Amino acid sequence: MYKRQGLGSLKDNIVDVVYCDSQYDKSYELTKELMKKYPDLKMIAGMNEYSSVGAARAVKAAKAENRIRVVGVDSSQEAVQLMEHGIFQGIVVQKAFKMGYVGVRETVKMLRGEDYKKNINSGCQLVTPDNMYTSEIEKLLFPFNTLKTYGDLTS
């Protein structure tokens, strides 16, 4: 059984929890099953890139983006394109550059025998269609400005 701690009054809004084993196709199929099992489903939250994008693909294929909100964790070029086309309403993005910088900095301190922090929260950012092209968010989504197209997302 999964834990619902920290959700407060929202815990009863969760109708199911499924695991895709970090596989896009499995997430896609599980999402199709959830949409069939729960015809009044209002939202799907994916907790990593695979579950998020797989779910978004299934919602898009079912043309259910106006009925089911999709939010996720982690970003990719495909996730950004799915957000541009109204499939994702939000994605939580890690601050990877800061994570790497702080990780190296603390490792150097450790190797020098200096005091270092063992646990550091490098932060994350909620990205939405409204803020995705602000300067700060673009740096998180496109750190090296490489963009690959993932098929025709308009159909």
What is the predicted function of each stretch?
Residues D16-Q81:
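Hydrophobic alpha-helical
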Residues Q5, L10-K11, E65:
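Conserved H-loop
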Residues G6, E33-K37, A58-A62, L82, ...:
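Structured segments of extracytoplasmic/periplasmic soluble domains
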Residues G54, L82, V102, E106:
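Alpha-helical scaffold segments in soluble metabolic enzymes
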Residues H85-F97:
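Short beta-strand elements at the ligand-binding edges of bilobed clamshell
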Residues I14-V17, V70, I91, L126:
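Conserved beta-strand scaffold positions in the cores of enzyme catalytic domains, especially
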Residues G6-L7, K95-S155:
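Hinge/cleft segment of the Venus flytrap/periplasmic-binding protein
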Residues M1-Y2:
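Short, small-residue-biased leader/transition segments that mark boundaries at the very start
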